[in-house]
């Protein structure tokens, strides 16, 4: 069981590390700034929800 779990973790770690260093094809190079900002968007939604709840006094 532990071997399967460690294999899954190792596989996902290797996959994610190659994912972070991947480059867009040359035809889509103009979208690089947008792609760099995209991972931050869920954090912005979380902050928006937090500010919204603070505005209504966390009802």
From Swiss-Prot:
Keyword Chloroplast among UniProt keywords: yes
Residues making up the propeptide: 1-22
InterPro entries for the chain: PSII_PsbK (IPR003687), PSII_PsbK_sf (IPR037270)
Subcellular location: Plastid, Chloroplast thylakoid membrane
Protein known as: Photosystem II reaction center protein K
A single GO BP: photosynthesis
GO cellular component, one term: chloroplast thylakoid membrane
Membrane topology annotation: Single-pass membrane protein
């Amino acid at each position: 069981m532990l071997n399967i779990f460690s294999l899954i973790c190792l596989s996902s770690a290797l996959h994610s590390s190659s994912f972070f260093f991947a480059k867009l094809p040359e035809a889509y190079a103009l979208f690089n700034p947008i792609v760099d900002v995209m991972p931050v968007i869920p954090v912005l939604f979380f902050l928006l929800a937090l500010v919204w709840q603070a505005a209504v006094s966390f009802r």
